[in-house]
A protein has these predicted regions:
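Positions that flank functional sites
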Residues: 39-40, 116
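Glyoxalase I/VOC metalloenzyme domain signal
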Residues: 2-7, 12-31, 50-223
Length: 223
């Protein structure tokens, strides 16, 4: 059996969700549509197709929910500006992919079940890995230009029997390329190899994830 994962989605986080949706619209010429609320987590999202079975998730605080008892996911509470925070890949067998990564020295974290409802009321359910928070940045982590955390190693996700979000007729902007910058490319590549994932990585200060999209007048870069 092959364990090669495929790109599932990119995560673009923001301190104010509406402003992030406007920014993506201005950059790409296409407006992300509402995805739904993550009840209890204090977030909601908008979605934009990237071609094939991949999509962009624009996520931020949900002003219609009370403050959650725990920090919002992806370090959203610490953001001062919108940016790409991390990405997700979909392996054919989530549990087998986690076991293989651990054998290779890379622990993706525990697997957790999550869900949300779409604006039409459809329940989406999935499982994903949640990287453990350590005392300092790991091989796939770093700080972005605003000092916030960036995770360059993808998390793993499995949608089970749920219809994939990309199959819901999303407006789309083709993804042309995805790359990363990290202060220790060799360590990052080792983590990617353990997950069975390929990503173009260049050396540089801090950490950054960059997606090249087919904009209305040519390629544009979302960071």
């Amino acid at each position: 059996m092959s364990y090669e994962p495929t790109l599932d989605h990119l995560v673009f986080g923001a301190p104010v969700l509406a402003a992030a949706v406007d920014a993506v619209h201005a950059l790409t010429g296409v407006r992300p549509v509402e995805g739904g609320r993550h009840v209890g987590l204090g977030t909601r999202n908008h979605l934009l197709g990237l071609g094939g079975s991949a999509y962009l998730e624009v996520i931020g605080p949900d002003p219609d929910q009370p403050e959650p008892p725990q920090p919002r996911p992806f370090g959203i509470d610490a953001l001062t500006s919108p940016r790409l925070l991390t990405w997700a890949v979909h392996p054919p067998d989530l549990d087998a992919a986690v076991a293989r990564a651990r054998r290779r020295g890379q622990d993706p974290g525990p697997v957790r079940a999550m869900s949300r409802r779409t604006p039409s009321g459809e329940l989406l359910e999935w499982r994903l890995t949640v990287p453990a928070d350590g005392d300092g940045p790991g091989p796939g982590e770093g700080t972005g230009a605003d000092g916030g955390a960036v995770r360059l190693l993808p998390f793993l996700i499995d949608w089970g029997s749920t219809r994939h979000p990309s199959a819901s007729g999303l407006p789309a902007v083709p993804l042309l390329a995805l790359s990363a910058r990290h202060a220790d490319p060799a360590a990052l590549r080792a983590g990617l190899d353990a997950l069975g994932v390929e990503l173009s990585v260049r050396a540089g200060p801090g950490a950054e994830l960059a997606a090249v999209l087919a904009g209305p007048s040519g390629p544009v870069v979302l960071r």
